[in-house]
Structure formats: C-alpha cells, structure tokens
C-alpha cells in the first residue's frame, strides 16, 4: 500500500504527528510527502494547522515546526536530512513512531523495521553503544551529508546502510 493511500483523509493528523517526531522540516519536504493532495487541499490543511496553533512557520517560510520553541531548539540539519530519508521509504511504512535516541524515527513495514539515525560527530558514540542491542532484522539507516563520518561507526553483520543526502534531497545509498 502506498503512503498516499494509507494517509488518505488523515493528512492533518499525519502532518501533526510527523512534525512532533522530526521537530523541524522544510516546507518543500512536507509538500513533496503530500504531493498526492491538490494544492488547494494541502493549503486548507496547512491553514487550519496554523490557525489552531499546531504549526509554526519560520519567518523566511522555509521551515515548519510544531512551535517556535521547537524550531529554535531542534537540530535542523539532522531533522531535515532524516525527513528526506523518510520521504524515500514512505511507501514501505505501515506505521511509525518516535525512536529511542539517537534514532529519530522507527518505521515499521510488513517484514522489518527501519531506524532513521542522523550521523553526526555527537552521535557516533551513542550509535556504537547501541549496535549490540539492535534486532538483527532491523535495518539501520545512518543519515548524513558528510561521508567522512562513517569511518567512526561500528558495523553490524548486515542491514546497515548509509544514506548520503545532498542539499536538494538527492539520496545515494551505500551498504556499510
């Protein structure tokens, strides 16, 4: 089942849920994720969320967040990179929830779980600590815009991937 079919008529709830998990995303990313909606319908949803105080737009209108405080405190770079990865795997998602740090989100599909983990200098130690605790069937996506960071990551036997994300959302996938 595609993401569009799964969220049909529940887009408002899904947008709120995704913003609460990711913290900050780019406006263009959210529009891309919900591209199945006509512009008019998407606009109505965003207007309603804004009117009810459930969404905050940065002054430059580039980012969306659940609140101004969240927009100021969230690591934008990592949230945006992980959201690009979520867009990439959205059709595999049957359900998703906030992950245990450093994982931002865990996406469940029929046969496996996907953990989207931002790869940064600050996260490497925590990522390496959790390598033994991860179920073997879980796929670990380490998300970065700097491939030099992967040299410090301990590799599992299988199901470890690096998603190298460009500024335009272009994604290159490498097995770790």
PLM features: what roles do these ranges have?
Residues 5-12, 39-43, 75, 79, ...:
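Short, structured coil/loop segments at alpha-helix boundaries
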Residues 16, 43, 47, 86, ...:
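Generic detector of well-ordered alpha-helical segments enriched in charged/polar residues
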Residues 1-72:
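Nuclease-adjacent, charged terminal/linker segments that flank catalytic cores
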Residues 114-170:
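Catalytic cores of nucleic-acid endonucleases
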Residues 34, 46-50, 85-93, 131-134:
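Hydrophobic, Leu/Ile/Phe/Ala-enriched alpha-helical segments that form helix-helix packing faces
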Residues 14-21, 54-129:
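Nucleic-acid-binding surface
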Residues 3, 27-28, 89-91, 114-115, ...:
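N-terminal start-of-chain detector that recognizes signal peptides
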Residues 1-18, 154-176:
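Non-catalytic C-terminal interaction segments of nucleic acid-processing enzymes
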């Amino acid at each position: 089942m595609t993401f569009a079919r799964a969220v049909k008529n529940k887009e408002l709830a899904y947008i709120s849920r995704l913003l609460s998990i990711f913290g900050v995303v780019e406006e263009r990313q959210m529009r891309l994720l919900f591209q199945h909606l006509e512009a008019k319908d998407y606009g109505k949803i965003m207007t309603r969320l804004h009117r009810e105080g459930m969404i905050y737009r940065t002054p430059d209108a580039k980012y969306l967040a659940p609140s101004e405080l969240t927009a100021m405190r969230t690591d934008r770079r990592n949230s945006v990179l992980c959201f690009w990865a979520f867009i990439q795997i959205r059709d595999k998602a049957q359900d998703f929830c906030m992950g245990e740090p450093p994982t931002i989100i865990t996406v469940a599909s029929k046969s496996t779980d996907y953990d989207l983990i931002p790869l940064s200098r600050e996260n490497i130690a925590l990522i390496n600590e959790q390598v033994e605790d991860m179920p073997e069937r879980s796929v670990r996506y380490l998300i970065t815009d700097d491939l030099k960071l992967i040299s410090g990551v301990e590799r599992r036997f299988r199901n470890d991937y690096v998603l190298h994300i460009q500024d335009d959302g272009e994604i290159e996938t490498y097995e770790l």
